[in-house]
């Protein structure tokens, strides 16, 4: 079995696993919510095989995450159901725990880890995840590792912070060749040797009952759940199958026009993959691989003399160059920024020149000033902006070119830049399926 590269591993508790006194390996799945192209899951399988132990995949869904709503819950549960089906075909055991009251998950990881040799979880650099995984160190007494499966280049590889996309692109072009040939396994669970043997203490499953996806109605469950239902379920369906269907549709119909029309709201030339990326339901590696296969591209076509340029380095078509710049440069710059800058979502995180310019124009006369409520319900004089906000509120997405207009106009219509940023973050985090956390720090990937 191919080993997970050490550049993707962070050990939070460096304890030698004791296979004699423990029963299983745990993969605590919190960000990379998929069974394919997942380095974290692959690492868990690696440890389980090394120790001749079964694997438990623990995937919780807490109730009171920031801006929690039926929209996000439904999208995630659609994905969890498919994970449940995939794991059922393997030798692993899937333990989905969905809270019906806040804080119900508290204590479950601690109890399960008492008989675990190793606990593996996702190294996701933003939202509440870093704080949650760090806090868990106090509850876990065995070996505890974070594994990065965010993008093509490991997020902790660089020791330097990059602010400009051009500089980050040069850094990527210098390092990418090593990582585009080093990919996670397509189906890591197929490598698992040991069958699950009912080794979980039954008292644990009685206290924290796993959700039964096979015999439950997700919609009926959500109807009864005490959660914000004012943010409606999106017509965009979650899950790996829907992600793959959308990817295939994009390659067949939109990709050929991507470079020319991705910013045209009247065309459907963008990939629309962002929701699936954000919720970890599909991997950048898989999308990269599918585009490479479609193009018939190989690393021999790379032109090192064009390192740092937006076009030409890949030696591929115009569409491929453009798509990979969004998929890799801009998306991974977002992760990089969140790793290097803890205040990435605060006004103070902006570059000095930006803060200076915004400050100089903070007192400029504004023809229109709107409240957060007026913006929320599209009550402005601008029909195009209203349409973009309607799409965000009703569907959870905004066409990528209109999203830039959306943000610029909020800045123009707010009392000052600080208020504008707070409005953008509130609207974005409450409604958006695809722009949460990392991509806000840089730009949207696709």
PLM region spans:
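Single conserved hydrophobic/aromatic residue that forms the stacking wall/gate
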Residues: 437-446
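Aromatic-anchored, charged helix-turn/loop surface patch used as a conserved interaction hotspot
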Residues: 322-388
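N-terminal regions that are enriched for targeting/export leaders
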Residues: 1-25, 30
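Active/binding-pocket-proximal capping segment
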Residues: 343-345, 351-363, 403-431
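Glycine/tryptophan-enriched, flexible segments
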Residues: 21, 154, 161-339, 343-348
């Amino acid at each position: 079995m191919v080993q997970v590269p050490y550049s993707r591993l962070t050990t939070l508790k460096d304890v030698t696993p004791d296979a004699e006194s423990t029963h299983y390996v745990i993969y605590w799945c919190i960000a990379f919510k998929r069974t394919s192209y997942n380095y974290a899951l692959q690492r868990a399988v690696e440890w389980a095989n090394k120790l001749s132990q079964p694997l438990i995949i623990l995937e919780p869904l807490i109730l009171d995450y920031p801006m929690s709503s039926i929209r996000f819950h439904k999208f995630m549960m659609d994905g969890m159901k498919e994970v449940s089906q995939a794991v059922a075909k393997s030798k692993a055991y899937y333990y989905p725990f969905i809270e019906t009251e806040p804080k119900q998950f508290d204590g479950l990881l601690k109890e399960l880890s008492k008989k675990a040799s190793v606990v593996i979880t996702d190294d996701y650099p933003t939202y509440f995840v870093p704080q949650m995984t760090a806090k868990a160190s106090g509850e876990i007494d065995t070996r505890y590792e974070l594994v990065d499966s965010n993008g093509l280049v490991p997020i902790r590889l660089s020791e330097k912070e990059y602010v400009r996309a051009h500089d980050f692109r040069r850094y990527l072009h210098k390092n990418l060749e090593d990582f585009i040939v080093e990919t996670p396994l397509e189906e890591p669970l197929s490598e698992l040797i040991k069958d699950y043997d009912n080794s979980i203490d039954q008292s644990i499953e009685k206290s924290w009952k796993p959700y039964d996806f096979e015999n439950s109605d997700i919609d009926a469950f959500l109807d009864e759940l005490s959660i914000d239902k004012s943010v409606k379920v999106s017509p965009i369906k979650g899950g790996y199958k829907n992600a793959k269907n959308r990817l295939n549709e994009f390659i067949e119909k939109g990709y050929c026009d991507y470079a020319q029309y991705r910013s045209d709201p009247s065309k459907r030339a963008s990939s629309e993959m962002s929701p699936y990326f954000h919720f970890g339901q599909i991997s950048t590696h898989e999308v990269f691989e599918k585009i490479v296969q479609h193009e018939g591209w190989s690393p021999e076509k790379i032109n090192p003399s064009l390192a740092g340029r937006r076009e030409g380095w890949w030696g591929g078509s115009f569409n491929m160059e453009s798509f990979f710049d969004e998929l890799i440069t801009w998306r991974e710059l977002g992760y990089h920024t969140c790793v290097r800058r803890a205040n990435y979502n605060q006004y103070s995180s902006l570059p000095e020149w930006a803060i200076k310019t915004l400050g100089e124009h903070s007192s400029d006369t504004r023809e229109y000033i709107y409240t957060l409520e007026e913006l929320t319900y599209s009550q402005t004089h601008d029909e195009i902006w209203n349409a973009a906000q309607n799409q965000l509120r009703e569907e959870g997405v905004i066409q990528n070119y209109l999203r830039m207009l959306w943000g610029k106009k909020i800045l123009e219509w707010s009392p000052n830049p600080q208020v504008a940023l707070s409005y953008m973050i509130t609207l974005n985090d409450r409604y958006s399926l695809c722009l949460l956390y990392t991509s806000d720090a840089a730009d949207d990937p696709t």
